[in-house]
Each structure stands twice: as structure tokens, then as C-alpha cells.
Amino acid sequence: MNITKIISKTFDSRLKQIDLYATQASEIQHSVLNRLVHQAAQTEWGKKYDYSSIRSYEDFRKRVPIQTYEEIKPYVERLRAGEQNLLWPSEIRWFAKSSGTTNDKSKFLPVSKEALQDIHYRGGKDAAALYFRINPDSHFFSGKGLILGGSHSPNLNSNHSLVGDLSAILIQNVNPLINFVRVPSKKIALMSEWETKIEAIANSTIPVNVTSLSGVPSWMLVLIKRILEKTDRKSVV
């Protein structure tokens, strides 16, 4: 029995919603904007731009100017120090660290619980739903998923927040049930020392039936190369 066929059926209802994106994209985007504006209306940022009186995209466009990260940075620094209800109403404790492509400085991007659930995790589920539609005979769930991410650490300047790669934040906060169908363990996945981490992941993964890969392609290539070296094989298939 192909267990993937059974599990993939749970994604069918979501596919119907995804299909609406192609026919009602504009309406959906306006709905999302209105919802976000309403939710953030009582934050310091929302009050500054009088979000409570915004009724349309045109209102938002005229009221809220395009701004750079440097202009928003003071709010981010206050959030990292423990202040809340500045840019978003729910508690912000996680900050994703960018690679610093602008001004050669890393940026700290606030990550709310809503962003995790409604964007990142839902996006992953949507990608899986579309994959199963295109590949109905997939054996995705017949083995485990190899997930390769970065690491995170406490904010050295404040005990109110944690900083890390977005991938590490996703691994740390994912539904615990995922731990039963993925490798490596969370402890290994979040190691900060890269060489030690690659060795640990390779050693824990080699004996496992891996049926999917998730992670930054360049990082994954390094890991796969190491696994091939350790097993003296030419292919992972």
C-alpha cells in the first residue's frame, strides 16, 4: 500500500482554495491587506498612520509611504529589547537574520507566530499539495524527509529575543509531529558549528530511507557530497 496516496488526500480541500488564486487573485490580495491593516490598527505603527480609518488599497497607498529598513530599524531595535505592540499586535520574540546584502550589514526581521503559521508553514503545505497533484504516484511519505537548516542563538544584548537563520526558526517552532518523519533530530539540525553539523547529519542520515530533501540547495549539495564520500557511492538514488 502506498501510504502517500492516503495522506495526500488530506490536501485536497486546500487545493480548491489554491485554485482560487488564479481566478480571484486581486480580490484575495485586497482581503489580506484589509485583514492585516485591521489587525495592526492598535499598534504604535498602526496608530501613526491611522490604520483604523483605512478602508481600501488606495487609502493605504496614500497614507503609508514606502520606507527602507533603516527607517524601520528603530522599531526593530525596540522589539529586540523587549517592547511589544509596535509593528504587530502579537508577541515578537524571534528575529530572522538576513545575509546582509545591503550595506554589508545583517538585518533583523521580526517573525511573528502568525507569519510562521500563515505564511511559512502554510506555504510548505501548499507546495506539498501542488506536488501531490502533479505527482499522484509519489512515495513522499514512504520514508523520512531530510531537512537542512541553519542555527539560532539568544540575543546577546537582551534576553527578550532570539536571533537566527529563518530555516532554524522554522525547525525550532515546527509541529512536534514532524519530528517523527524527518531527519536529523532537532538537536543536530540546530547545531551552530557547520563542519560538526555536516558530519552529524551525514552519520545520522546514512542508515535512513530518505524520500525528500528540504533546504538551501548549496548547503544540501555539500551534505550530499559528504554522504557520498562516507558511503563510497556515486549516487544517493
Predicted regions and their residues:
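Active-site phosphate/ATP/adenylate-binding loop shared across adenylate-forming ligases
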Residues: 1-237
